[in-house]
Each structure stands twice: as C-alpha cells, then as structure tokens.
C-alpha cells in the first residue's frame, strides 16, 4: 500500500516536530526546507494536522508550529487513518461487473487491516527515540 504524499509528508513533519525540545516552536518554512517540499502543500498538511490536534499552531510575530500532544501519544495508525483515503479499490457494481462474486475485496480489506495493525504498534516517539542518525539527518542536536 502506497501512502499519498499528503500522509507521507504529514508523518515527516510530525517526526521533525517531535525532535524539537518540548514546547519549542518552529516554522512551516523550516519544515519545508528540511524536506524540500512545496510550502503550499505543507501549509495544507499542517492545517489538517492542527485540526486533528497533532500540531499546535501559534499565530503572530513569535508564532510557529509544534507538536500538539506528547509524541508517545501519537499512534502512527491513527495519523494514517485520519489523513489517508483507505479505500484500496473501487468495488461498486457500477464500476466492476464481477463484484458480486469477487473475493479480492475481502483479501484487500484484510491486508489493509494488517497494515494498520502494524502501524498501531508504533508511536511517533518510537521513531525518534534513541535514533541519533535521524537527528543528524534532520540537523538536530544529538544528546548522549
């Protein structure tokens, strides 16, 4: 299953925000610079993540963005469910004439469930915890 770029960059943005000291603000521009992503696309992503409570957005001269909840409470499967259209195939009878006899839909639904179940085992914190190479790649300080 391939994630949309929206979900992919949303997860990447959350990873970057999770590497910041608690409460520290950064800018959307910084996140786009780190990942080389379109600022307009990232604004839409951060807006959605903000609506979902994963990101706090602070307006004003000293504003910015930061995680909206502790990284250990952000479950990857929940983020994917909230940002990803999870319909793998269109199985309506109008679209496919074998729908009444097809077993593929059930198999794909099981595969999607297994995919999400694996993501449910991991939090945002588990991606960054004890991962100095990631911190180096994100140009974040590595603490011993």
Curated annotation (Swiss-Prot):
Its cofactor is [2Fe-2S] cluster. GO terms for cellular component: cytosol. [2Fe-2S] cluster binds at residues 91, 96, 102. Residues 28-51 bind DNA. Keywords: 2Fe-2S, DNA-binding, Iron, Iron-sulfur, Metal-binding, Repressor, Transcription, Transcription regulation. Binds 1 [2Fe-2S] cluster per subunit. This is HTH-type transcriptional repressor NsrR. It comes from Photobacterium profundum (strain SS9).
